Amino acid sequence: FLDVGCMSTKPDFKILSLDEEIIRLYFFIDNMSDKFYYSIDTLNPLVAERALDSGFLIINDVSGFVDSKMIDLAIKKECGVIVMHRNPGSENIHQKADYEDVVDQVNTHLIIQTENLIEKGVNRSQIAVDPGLGFGKKMEDSKELFFNLHNLINTYPIVVGYSRKKFTDQLNMTNNEMIDHCLDSGVDLLRLHLDN
């Protein structure tokens, strides 16, 4: 299973033009293998549609599906969707929020986000959720979430991406230990970089 992103979403990322993102996508499509399943990591519904038309099966939208066109596309294509947690008060995916109880609040927000998709017409069976480690969260909040993955909502498959996140430098854990922790906590899919 490969999650393909044509644009970085690191804290200092710059929005690519639609043309540039699609050029990068087509470069990958030209080299796709039928040995893998693919998801597209994008904020742009047009990029997501091109990917789905080329054999991708899942939209991984780190903005949390705030764009109604992305929701409409998921309904039209009946594809899988990975809904990443996003604080409803944030203006962008990396704006840090203040949490009193990060686990409880992330669960609450994910319930609101997924129920919104279902109300719009996305099938419940299409949905997986991602707590958004390192996105809009202080290091302590990401660490708290990481050690409480077993307390996340279990209504949907859980996707976790800790790879290359700064908070992991403070965990004193090897990559294999982090993988074991996630799997023991009930995580269904791990998003790792190729060098992991």
Report residues per predicted region.
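N-terminal glycine-rich anion-binding loops that anchor highly charged ligand groups
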Residues: 1-6
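Short linear capping/connector segments at secondary-structure termini
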Residues: 7-10, 130-132
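Active-site-adjacent loop and "lid" segments of alpha/beta metabolic enzymes
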Residues: 9-33, 37, 45, 52, ...
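Conserved SAM-binding loop
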Residues: 40
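A generic short-segment signal for beta-strand/edge and adjacent turn/coil regions
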Residues: 50-51, 130
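Active-site rim beta-loop-alpha module in soluble metabolic enzymes
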Residues: 92-93, 113-140
